[in-house]
């Protein structure tokens, strides 16, 4: 509907949904859940005060919320609740936040719908610390993956 992806776009989130390599290597070890409709994984980019945040994507290439089929949107929403509860139980965080961007004016920079779920801690200043990000190693992500996968069983 309101699409902005460039011609010949190679979608990194489609690659993750299919279990393929991305420009940042394989993300398969970061996947905490996958079914025929959605994939959830520990994000590749972290904010230092909020490690282990999760991204949920539709497996089908859907650029933004405007094109989201209701059935898949409901599955993403339902799973985001499971992630939020898992954060509270396993990360012992003080709260959670979700974030989702559409179109360039909405700060979308990957042309595949994705919902971020962040663990929140009192005084973490998540929305003020955009410069305090980094790309964690697979080893650094592993304890978060294991906690969430175990909780989801």
List each language-model region with its residue ranges.
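HIT superfamily nucleotide-processing domains
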Residues: 1-153
